[in-house]
Curated annotation (Swiss-Prot):
Protein family per UniProt: Belongs to the DNA mismatch repair MutS family.
This protein's name: DNA mismatch repair protein MutS
Source organism: Clostridium botulinum (strain Okra / Type B1)
Function as written in the Swiss-Prot or TrEMBL entry: This protein is involved in the repair of mismatches in DNA. It is possible that it carries out the mismatch recognition step. This protein has a weak ATPase activity.
Keywords: ATP-binding, DNA damage, DNA repair, DNA-binding, Nucleotide-binding
PROSITE patterns in alphabetical order: DNA_MISMATCH_REPAIR_2
Matching InterPro entries: DNA_mismatch_repair_MutS (IPR005748), DNA_mismatch_repair_MutS-lik_N (IPR007695), DNA_mismatch_repair_MutS/MSH (IPR017261), DNA_mismatch_repair_MutS_C (IPR000432), DNA_mismatch_repair_MutS_clamp (IPR007861), DNA_mismatch_repair_MutS_core (IPR007696), DNA_mismatch_repair_MutS_N (IPR016151), DNA_mismatch_repair_MutS_sf (IPR036187)
Xref: NCBIfam families: mutS1 (TIGR01070), PRK05399.1 (NF003810)
GO MF, any single term: ATP binding
Gene Ontology biological process terms, A to Z: mismatch repair
Cellular compartments per GO CC: cytosol
SUPFAM superfamilies in the record: DNA repair protein MutS, domain I, DNA repair protein MutS, domain II, DNA repair protein MutS, domain III, P-loop containing nucleoside triphosphate hydrolases
Binding site for ATP: 615-622
Signal sequence range: none
Amino acid sequence: MGLTPMMRQYLEVKESCKDCILFFRLGDFYEMFFEDAKVASKELELVLTGRDCGLEERAPMCGIPYHAANTYIGRLVSAGYKIAICEQLEDPSASKGIVKRGIIKIITPGTYTDSSFLEENKNNYIMSFYLDDNMCAMSFADISTGEFNSTHSNFKEAVVLDEISKFAPREIVLEENIKESFIHTIKERFPNISISKIKEENFDYNIDNNLKEQFNNFNENEYETIVKKSANGLLYYIFHTQKNILSNINKIDYYSIVDYLTIDVNSRRNLEITENLREKTKKGSLLWVLDKTNTAMGGRQLRRWIEQPLINKNPIENRLNAVEELLNNISLQEDLKEDLKSIYDIERIVGKVASKSVNAKELISLKCSIGKVPYIKKYLSNFKSDLFLNMEQCIDTLEDIHKLLDKALLDNPSLSVKEGNIIKEGFNEEVDSLREAKSNGKKWIASLEQKEKEETGIKSLKVSYNKVFGYFIEITKANLNLVPEGRYIRKQTLSNAERYITPELKEMEEKILGAEEKLIDIEYKLFTKIRDFIEENIDRMQKTARIISDIDCLCSLATVALENNYIKPNINAKNEILIEEGRHPVVEKVIPKGEFISNDSLIDTKENQLILITGPNMAGKSTYMRQVALITIMAQIGSFVPAKKANISICDKIFTRIGASDDLAAGKSTFMVEMWEVSNILKNATSKSLVLLDEVGRGTSTYDGLSIAWSVIEYICNNKNLRCKTLFATHYHELTKLEDNIEGVKNYSVSVSELENEIVFLRKIIRGGADQSYGIEVAKLAGLPSPVINRAKEILQHIEGDKEENSLNITPSKEYKSKDYIEASKDTLNTKNNLESEIKHDTLSETNAATIVEDESTKEHLSSNKKQINCRINDEKSIKKEVAVDSFQINFEYIKRDKIIEEIKNIDILNMTPMEGFNKLYDIINKTKDID
């Protein structure tokens, strides 16, 4: 038994796209067969059926309606699959034998441009990577906007990973013979990125001609061969998947990695530049604070500014001056912002023009958008700063395009371009004539209905239309005796009516439908001509769109500066960072207004090269260090900064080593990862770099950790080729002695006040080292039971006493008695005041900005609290036997036992942020106040 012709055709098509799920068009459905069907049915939750295919067993099959395909495609692409779309290439009714079919497009994570899949304020990049000896080249494209960027450098894995982190591509195209170890590294760091491989020859083939044909600014002598190969490989892949040359990709932008501030992968994560650490979402990041853009284009551009801060003084100052001018002209700024709100995503609309997928409604959106450009140009003429003057001179008002769209298209056209109702009256004589014929025909139909009602006496008679029978006269069965004989021709019988036609009705039907069909055809042809004209002018619209996005970014920075009382930083060439009353831009937004404690900073490459910060956990050391880095980044993107005064030197790189980061899946411990990160910093930092090191050495034994931290400080300060500006937080108080021995080391600490055996964090960074870590006091604040705290103090006294004798002699404690647990329970609830005053601010200060993600000490305190609560509840009965009821009433007598104790039992505190934990505790406390 042989394969059926259709199945033979399917397998031939499938052979050309083995790495894709094939959507095979059969009538009104896309069908999937064999393994593709099994995968799709699982991922899309479709029923898996079977189809006779000429083999002994039925072929597994599932399908989806073609008109709903985008929803299903988006789900598969989001899961990392590629989809090959196989369409019917001829009219089935006109074909003899099997319908001709072929792949019209391959959809991949990096090339899918459906609006439902794309994030409005984020690019959808696809990247290519080419390696040759010790050099590598990378190209990044967003086919929805037309951006195409390329760069190259000496090959270092860290450099490649940094660029991937910066652009966050959905897909990476590699040469098929590249080392698997490198691919493994990429997948390990970026598990959600799809990897695609192409042959070596696709990077080389017809390279100069391809690039000249695609890019109107390409000069083959300006680019290294390796860069051209990377770009050519990416263009090949785009053409291979889209089956078309995209006219919106018309310019290649080469950038040098060293032209922008380098922020490595770990630093982007630790500083929460564009997403928070915990949920990987925008909220709680620097981007979240700075993004007040009014257009999708501006939102994407601001993200790029933040991902790639500048390192050249002039462009930084140009942006700062423009922001300052906006702040000095609030009325003009508000007018600008109001018009920006009316501008749609010009870049992605013209991207749809290039791919021939734009509809008439989207062109109306384009018309409305470019209609605002003359007003924006007029506003720009009122500014004096260099950046705005240049924008005013360069912006194209696109009035010819606006005029055409306004004259040609209806204000509310059909969604489908193949259903007519697109072209405005007066634009084309033939369209107007056919519309009149169609309208007159329908008037004739209406008059016919009235005439037949009068002649037959059937008041319920109707003249109707459907696509199967055309126009017909419908008469209910109750009135069939009134139907005139000979003139009505029966067409269809229904359960409660009969349908008839007449010769004159069929004659008019042909005229009406002929006019309608012709009208739709002419309107579509006119629409394609309009679309082609716009496509010829894509470059003009893209340039205007970029200027609009820059204006939107500057307005956003001005808005944020005004709302948050930011100041204009001075950019210096002294290799010095001087900040007066600096504030963390994110943390100050998530705590009550006015409660953030500002701090000064002075870091240079001479006397204040390494700022050694000591003090207890939860006191704010990490927040302070991140604050300095974020203020520096803000200054280098051209933003005002949260401070009273800021004098910022341009940094070439920012490195951070903050927080614990086990990589257990890769078999790496906290300490191993920590040392790898420190090694990377010491190898790549320069004298112009800013380095943040937090608790170096804490992942190993005390003396090993102290020795490593000491040695790292010496290396940074004594290595003449390094001497980078450094903030170094530590709990090793022995390191404070280095100020007297190493030039450039300066001791600072977090101010702490002791009141009646309690500590209060003052959040101020002051000159001089801390004399103790207050570890036990922090543990007490975190809610550890009194017996544990008291025992810890005893052990500490023994250890400190035994240090001089070079021995450690501690007698094990007796087993805790029930009364100890009573005290522990009291302490747990009595931490209310401490938790209210400390957790709220301490965890915000010491954790990763607004994500409120607990650090190691906070996790321990939360874990301890959970154990105390469980212990208190489980031992309730035994406690009651040993103590008077009154002595235990403080914990539970004021609580409605069943509801509130159950609520406490079910608290999953380890999966709460500290702020959520505080709010839950506060809620429980309030409930107890309502109980008599």
